[in-house]
Amino acid sequence: TPEVNESGDTRRRTTRFGGGQPRARRPVTDALLRDPPAADWPSWRRTLDGHGYSPLDQIDRGTVTDLRLAWVVSMEEGNNQATPLVHDGMMFLAHPQNVVQALDAATGDVLWEYRHPVPDDAAGFGATRTIALYGDKVFLATYDAALVALDASTGDVAWETVKADYTSGFMHFGGPVVADGVVVSGINGCGRYKEETCFI
């Protein structure tokens, strides 16, 4: 039976599954984001310079025909544009509708799942394009213009900051990035110019 942690708010729901156990992880540091281990993909496009290059060389032109399906996981219904992030054998997936999952990268077993339900009057129809890892946290920018920090081992909510009033048209589709310990997050919806202009 999945274990559910409501975190004192029914909008903040984390479910831990029996497919795997929360594990201790090395914290994601600035040095790791600049030069990650070969098997890690800790940020969008892997490194801060955005090259999107993996140094792994086991799969090449001679071995690509040997690839076989190892596991599969269903994604939430909607527009999937996310980059899976990988650190210390855990994969972090951002789904549409502000759902985040942590999986065992080797087996596909779901370790935990966080759902940030979107208010009925928020613009919750687009992709959740990426999330960010730093320290022991996973950062999610939500459709209702909040920034949520999750414990990377358990999925529990560490903190949440509301950045703007979603009823004025502000929202997030792009994800945050972390640089020098600072979480940087833009905002969408500024083209509506109801009360404010764009900001980061």
Language model segments and positions:
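Extracytoplasmic beta-rich repeat domains
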Residues: 72-85, 113-135, 160-175, 190-195
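Short loop/turn segments that connect beta-strands within beta-propeller blades
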Residues: 104-107, 151-154
